[in-house]
Amino acid sequence: AYRHSVFQHGYTIRPQGYKTNEIAELLGLKGNGEKHAEYVIANHISKFIAYFCNSDRHKVQELNYLDTVTDPKAQIFVKSFYDYIVAQSRLFLSKMDKGEIEITHDFYLKKFQLSNPVLNYDYILFDEGQDASPAMLDVFFKQKATKIIVGDTHQQIYGWRFAVNSLEKAAFTTYQLST
């Protein structure tokens, strides 16, 4: 994904991602007069972008960010700014796509997934399959190669990054490993 997306488009990577205040500044976000509202909006934009980039969807509009917001107060806030959050998320993604700002690792993976790559390998081994993003799985499942997923369902640690357990998503024969 890195070689295909970053080099081909001449992108520069932002190693640590963007902080909330940086997103607010880059987008010139405006709140509603409530203290720090623009930073709360920026935080939701950051989360929405991560949600989209890790999803198997092709457009931001295909996702409902509210599905990821569990706190009742946050839901009320997001509902009142939803269209603005979506528009600003799309603008931020556009800025990365045009090379106006550095891209994130999530972004180049998404760019790779959206390119529908064909990987010319006979076998593809997907390690740590319990922590796969839907974007990764979309690429993996579309390949013609013999596919193998290795993982441990009891070691899933990236759910907060929208990872899913690919071991449950694949209709593959399961083999138990032992020592």
Q: Where are the regions a protein language model picked out?
A:
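Conserved helicase motor core of SF1/SF2 NTP-dependent helicases
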Residues: A1, V118-L119, Y123, Q130-T179
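Conserved helicase/translocase P-loop NTPase motor core
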Residues: K73-K142
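Conserved P-loop NTPase-based nucleic-acid remodeling module centered on helicase motor cores
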Residues: A1-I49
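An accessory alpha-helical subdomain
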Residues: K30-S80
